[in-house]
Curated annotation (Swiss-Prot):
Disordered: region residues: 61-85, 177-258
Source lineage: Eukaryota, Viridiplantae, Streptophyta, Embryophyta, Tracheophyta
Coarse class of the protein's main subcellular location: membrane
Biased composition (Low complexity): 234-243
Ranges in a coiled coil: 91-156
Recorded topology in the membrane: Peripheral membrane protein
Bias (Basic and acidic residues): 177-193
Subunit structure: Clathrin coats are formed from molecules containing 3 heavy chains and 3 light chains. Interacts with TPLATE and CHC2.
UniProt xrefs under PANTHER family: CLATHRIN LIGHT CHAIN, CLATHRIN LIGHT CHAIN 2
Annotated organism of origin: Arabidopsis thaliana (Mouse-ear cress)
Function: Clathrin is the major protein of the polyhedral coat of coated pits and vesicles.
Name of the protein this chain belongs to: Clathrin light chain 2
GO molecular function: identical protein binding; structural molecule activity
Gene Ontology biological process terms in this record: intracellular protein transport; vesicle-mediated transport
Length: 258
């Protein structure tokens, strides 16, 4: 038998001089066939899914490093507003320049707004003055036109009884548009000036149709009613008497006999 076939090994005690041989061979009689499971084995390993023990309750991220009080479970770091910002020189300079530019811009905007308001107030004053002057001029022109119109109306009604047809012709507006003659090249080059002036009718841009009125007036002129007929005045005595210093004409029979 070789030395490797021996399954025994030596256990050295604290004292190296003493050694105890131990047999490492397996005895078949020491099998587990006689184990019936009646022996209760205590489970010394903790259940990983069980609730943590109360012994670990004091360890939390509270006020202390290990949370000895266990009451507060807030953040460890202070809020960002209380933390000092670590800014570089370039960022601080940019913030300073930006604040100066914003302040200057706000001043310019206020000055511009003030200038716009002043110009608007001045424009409103000038506009109101211009409107007042225009209204006064229009009132004066309308008074002159009204005065002239009343004079023409009085004159028309005073002379209408003498000649009815003339009065009717004046009342009826002209149906045919009047063509205005232009003179000079400057007036011809002006396209805005109208060449034909049309009397406006009830609809803008269309002349009044007076055909029916003209037919009625022509019919009345040829067959006037009795109240429109002019009464013929009797001839006066001077008109009936023969004129003086006029030689008497001889009868034609006496002239032929002679």
């Amino acid at each position: 038998m070789s030395a490797f076939e021996d399954d025994s090994f030596v256990i050295l005690n604290d004292d190296a001089s003493e050694s105890v041989p131990v047999s490492g061979s397996f005895d078949a009689t020491d099998s587990f066939s006689a184990f019936d499971g009646s022996l209760q084995v205590e489970d010394s390993v903790d259940d990983v899914f069980a609730a943590p023990s109360s012994d670990y309750g004091a360890y939390s991220n509270g006020d202390g490093i290990f949370g000895s009080n266990g009451d507060h479970d807030g953040p460890i770091l202070p809020p960002p507003s209380e933390m000092e910002s670590d800014e570089g020189f370039a960022l601080r300079e940019w913030r300073r320049q930006n604040a100066i530019q914003l302040e200057e811009k706000e001043k310019r905007e206020k000055e511009l707004l003030k200038q716009i308001i002043e110009e608007a107030d001045q424009y409103k004053e000038e506009f109101h003055k211009k409107i007042e002057v225009t209204c006064e001029n229009n009132k004066a022109a309308n008074r002159e036109k009204e005065k002239l119109y009343l004079e023409n109306q009085e004159k028309f009604y005073a002379e209408s009884s003498k000649n009815y047809w003339k009065a009717i012709a004046e009342l009826v507006p002209k149906e045919v548009p009047t063509i205005e003659k232009r003179r000079g090249k400057k007036e011809q080059q002006d396209p805005k000036k109208p060449t034909v002036s049309v009397i406006q009718g009830p609809k803008p841009g269309k002349p009044t149709d007076l055909t029916r009125m003209r037919q009625i007036l022509v019919k009345l002129k040829h067959n006037p009613p009795s109240h429109l007929k002019l009464t013929s005045q009797p001839p006066s005595e001077e008109a009936a008497a023969p004129p003086k210093n006029v030689p008497e004409t001889k009868p034609t029979e006496a002239v032929t006999a002679a």
